[in-house]
Amino acid sequence: MRRPQLLDRRWLTIILRSLRELIQRFDAHDGLKTASALTYTTLFAVVPFMTVLYAMLSAIPSFQGISEQLQALIFSQFVPATGSALVEHLRDFSRQARSLTLIGLMFLLVTAVMMMVTVERAFNNIWHVSRSRRGVSSFLLYWAVLTLGPLLLGSGFLLSSYLASLTLVRGAAEVLGGPVAFLRLLPLTLSFTAFVFIYMAVPNCRVRFRHAVAGAGLAALALELAKGAFSLYVTYFPSYQVIYGTFAAVPLFLVWVFLSWAIVLVGAELAAWLGERRRAEWRYWAPFWQALGVVSHLYDAHRRGQAVYDRELAMRLGARYSDVMAPLQTLGVAVQLDNDRWMLGRDLGALSLWDFQRAMPWAVPLGESSPAPEMQAIHAALQEAERHRQQVLTQPMEHLLAEGARNDSP
């Protein structure tokens, strides 16, 4: 009986530790500030997005008349009922925007693209990507989101309407709980699919499908739970109406948009964290890169004012744990505390890469690529040093020996 309890306790510890690390990542990347910035940008971009949605769906004869239904479906399923009044104003703004001139439409399109740029920068920061897309690649990404997104939503709406009209599907739906169950699963499915697409397409790096699925699942479930909790709060604690009166819908909508962006960013943090954990299988790295991985991990923890657990480093390093930590202790980079934790012991600003390389007992594996994104700059510096070393050592042996003989002669 004790063994299952120990296993359950171990899994609970792993889950709690993972949640703590996820929250720490979110805080380290200024998730709340980023969500605030995206909320501000959304205020200017929501009407252009609705206008683009209408324009794209109206351009295809099969989608005529779907845009209004699709907007109603999206807002009814993804926005709490408290924002219905504000949603009607947004629809009115979108209808008025359709009668703008070409210059006005271009301005709306630029506003929508600015929001995409902000989202891409936030995601690149989460995935530790220093360069954003430029030129044709960025244009293709934004064009795909602004065009394929509405088309896919319209196609999905048509498909769901068609399936709902089939006798066989309606019979199966009645057995499984009827159309109500289908409509309850529809927003979760739509948001999950959209998050998978966003997490894989927006960051300027390769994101594995299963990592995007994990992040999308967390974000979609959290969004549904948040929507229910938000609606309950507004229903049973209506004090906001006393304070804001008829303008109550505006701050509520802002809070909901902020909460939604925070959830989206948390899902992105999970997808990026899973990718980093996969790349952080240090036991398969060369010892030199393992030592650098330890230094990088200690440095990140030092910036957060924290220490690293001994068992975490042992799990990552595997059998080389003692061999890797010993020279780092001798160099003074890693210091072990009394509570089985490690912390950074030296100012890395006063430690050069040359001194670190000389202190390590292993050869630098220059033939290998950088094992992690945070080590790309160090890898590039080592390769540059190796190129200079090769230029010096490519002199013929005969020339060097003859030069030495001339210096030795009286």
From Swiss-Prot:
Coiled coil: none
Subcellular location: Cell inner membrane
Protein origin, superkingdom: Bacteria
Keyword entries, A-Z: Cell inner membrane, Cell membrane, Membrane, Transmembrane, Transmembrane helix
One GO CC term on file: plasma membrane
Disulphide bonds in the chain: none
Topology versus the membrane: Multi-pass membrane protein
Entry's transmembrane regions: 43-63, 99-119, 139-159, 180-200, 212-232, 247-267
Homology family: Belongs to the UPF0761 family.
Protein name (record): UPF0761 membrane protein Csal_1895
Native species: Chromohalobacter salexigens (strain ATCC BAA-138 / DSM 3043 / CIP 106854 / NCIMB 13768 / 1H11)
